[in-house]
Amino acid sequence: MPEHLSPREILDRLVAFPTVSTDSNLALVDWVEAWLAGWGIASHRVYNAEGSKAALYASVGPDVPGGVILSGHTDVVPVEGQDWHSDPWTVIERDGRLYGRGVCDMKGFDALALAALPLALEAGVKRPLQIALSYDEELGCTGALPMIRAMAAGLPRAAAVIVGEPSMMKVVTGHKGGHSFRVHLRGHEVHSSILHEGVSAIMQGARLIDWANRMNAENAARPATELGALFYPHWTTLHVGTISGGTAENITAKDCSFGLGFRVVPGEDPLDWVARLKAEAARITAEMQAVHPDAGITLEEKFVVTPLVPEQDGAAEALARRLTGDNAVRVVSYGTEAGHFQSEGYSAVVCGPGDIAQAHQPDEWLAVDQFAAGWQFMQDVVKDLCR
């Protein structure tokens, strides 16, 4: 028998699962799968290599092309170290806001999308409504591509993808791409009084970080491209967020590692930036090995987030603008899974409830009126699919 749940009741269920990216999401997937099965809606899983996490997708309606995909992710960021004033795994409504980890990013949208499936079933849509729920979005959208490719192989191709990251229900047509590396440096230890006989992994790493700073300065000084001018900032940025290494102050560091990330403006080739990084690392490595042959630099690729490029006459943009009435041009500098959908041949935009400023914060919240606006959008999507 189907279990009739409101969007808010579904949100309560989803938030109760602590699906931090470092942990499994299978308990949540089990619940979603069982709830959909109660409505007679079949769902499909796409597991990670270890079988510890899964993406889930489902479809309601006839097996014809031209439908709509509602895309969200199941994982959330940790709450450790944050000062919460209520249980982060229980949705609390207070002063027109819904509080809880993931309510904004992005279980609020997930709940609305799930609630829309029985609505589409009962309405008898003429084109399918599909849902896509990924894992590891917060770790670099690493769970998205296998899911997207499975959907492309197993379902009729949708005309539009709505990725429901928080945008205040405004239509976002472009975002920067992301490329993340962990840089590992191997040095050669000697007493720091004879520094010239050793190789400090930290000091050599600082040279690569200085290169990143110089690239930022050069990029900022260049005039914006027509597409780049839409973004803030309008240039590709390089950033080092974490670093570790060394043994003692009087020993040249035998190791150093740091995270280096790119946010690439659409229109620039991310692989060109990778080539530049590799060339600079090779140049520094050669100088390190001139002192000691075992010294060097290894680049470990962590993830790639494909940029979302504004489309000419895109079906997803046309649908989202028609249903929201929003015709302003908007792009963002953070990444989403919309770029991956677009790279696989889908028309995609970002449009979802909530403000990105609330994502990842202690006492994360979603305005009740945004949740209501998102539900109205879902109802309008279903009506559109009935035409």
Where in the sequence are the language-model features?
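Glycine/serine-rich anion-binding loops at beta->alpha junctions
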Residues: 96-112, 351
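Acidic/His- and Gly-rich active-site-bordering loop/insert found
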Residues: 1-101, 119-126, 355
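Acidic-glycine-rich active-site phosphate/pyrophosphate-binding loop
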Residues: 79-94, 158, 173-185
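Acidic, glycine-rich active-site loops and adjacent beta-strand->loop/helix elements
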Residues: 51, 74-75, 97, 132-141, ...
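Acidic/histidine-rich catalytic neighborhood of metal-dependent amide-processing enzymes
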Residues: 106-180, 386
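Metal-dependent amide/peptide-bond hydrolase catalytic core
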Residues: 2, 49, 182-387
